[in-house]
Amino acid sequence: MRDLSGLPAAAFGKYDTAPDELFYAEPRFVTHIDAYAIAAVTALYRELFPLEGVILDLMSSWVSHLPGDVPYREVIGHGMNERKLAANPKLSRFFLQNLNIDPMLPLETSSVDAAAICVSVQYLQKPVGVLRELARVLKPGSLVAITFSNRCFPTKAVMIWQAVPDVDHQRLVMFYLEQAGFGSIEARTLCPPGHSTDPLWAVIGRVPNSKSACA
């Protein structure tokens, strides 16, 4: 499969076809991975995200798993529920947007130093479009860290995510990033399956130093 045209039309459909705004209207003040997996996400962010950087937490929630002792210049949040984002103490500001309808991010080109998508990539119906926008707003050479587990809301996760085994989700996300123009793509297993913690995987992609390579 060289591009998304090789996938059936239903690959990015969902069982629940009602507007996403209805599903996310009521805030869920819960975490979707356990404390060990959360700690692994935090350690990854500590390693990868620059001090005093502008961080974009895409598809965020009432908590961001950024390390509390690291100074960032700004943390921009995005999500679908205003109450949850307003409750997140890590966010400097946030915006509401349904990326499945409009993947265009309301941010300046080359204005972000690093981006995170935590346990949410499975809900994107236009993953390559969203990631292309991330490549636009990220500075040359900067990165996005995408983390995911084996959990999801099954009525809202896209069909291809649910059809692909857990062991192949990394390959799928790497493919998304490749199609969106990212380079130096790296897959990591942060919490191996079969242990007492929730499994957790990460895929990291970097924007080429030449923005034209993302076009």
What do the PLM-derived regions correspond to, one by one?
Residues 1-51:
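Class I SAM-dependent methyltransferase Rossmann-like catalytic core
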Residues 35-36, 40-106:
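Class I SAM-dependent methyltransferase SAM/SAH-binding core
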Residues 40, 163-187:
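Short alpha-helix
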Residues 113-128:
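A short SAM/SAH-binding and catalytic strip from SAM-dependent methyltransferases
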Residues 128-143:
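A short glycine-rich, Lys/Arg-flanked "PGG" loop and its adjoining helix->strand segment in the class I
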Residues 143-174:
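Conserved class I S-adenosyl-L-methionine
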Residues 180-183, 190-215:
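Core SAM-dependent methyltransferase catalytic element
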